[in-house]
Amino acid sequence: MSSESRSASSPVAPDDIEEGVVLRPKFDAHGLVTVVATDARTGDVLMVAFMNDEALDRTIQTGEAWYYSRSRKRLWKKGETSGHIQKVLEMRVDCDQDAVWIKVDQTGGAACHTGRHSCFYRRIDRGGDGAPVLIETDAERKFDPDKVYGK
């Protein structure tokens, strides 16, 4: 389905969204939908990002993950700088189509721009005073971000 037909403003019955066979993503007010990327092999959550309609189309057409960067205000292909591309093996939408789940083969072993396997490398615990503290659970870096991104 083309982005033009997906973005058409014709009313859609809830049953068509929840039980139908047509992709009708519910983009937010900024034209974005939340995407959760997981490692297809391990099931680990790798990252949470956003797609606009064009990123979603490119992902479907190419089989590689494309996202929309809210900070840079542009499309980006995962791995365009690092080479750590996400090959999409399966895509799903949730019941009301306002979130996308992609199962990927993460090349290079790292999804996070910090060089780690996952962006979820810290656990929230409570310190001695009861205040929340972050505990690193994955210190291993697959690459040095300063070398890859030139920071």
From Swiss-Prot:
It is an enzyme of class 3 (hydrolase). Its EC number is 3.5.4.19. It catalyses: 1-(5-phospho-beta-D-ribosyl)-5'-AMP + H2O = 1-(5-phospho-beta-D-ribosyl)-5-[(5-phospho-beta-D-ribosylamino)methylideneamino]imidazole-4-carboxamide. The gene is hisI. Its cofactor is Mg(2+); Zn(2+). The keyword Magnesium applies. Mg(2+) binds at D94, D96, D98. One of its GO terms (molecular function) is phosphoribosyl-AMP cyclohydrolase activity. Zn(2+) binds at C95, C112, C119. One of its GO terms (cellular component) is cytoplasm. Keywords: Amino-acid biosynthesis, Cytoplasm, Histidine biosynthesis, Hydrolase, Magnesium, Metal-binding, Zinc. It comes from Rhodopseudomonas palustris (strain TIE-1). Belongs to the PRA-CH family. This is Phosphoribosyl-AMP cyclohydrolase. Pathway: Amino-acid biosynthesis; L-histidine biosynthesis; L-histidine from 5-phospho-alpha-D-ribose 1-diphosphate: step 3/9. Its main location: cytoplasm. It is found in: Cytoplasm. Binds 1 Mg(2+) ion per subunit. Homodimer. GO terms for biological process: L-histidine biosynthetic process. InterPro entries: PRA-CH, PRib_AMP_CycHydrolase_dom, PRib_AMP_CycHydrolase_sf. The keyword Cytoplasm applies. Catalyzes the hydrolysis of the adenine ring of phosphoribosyl-AMP.
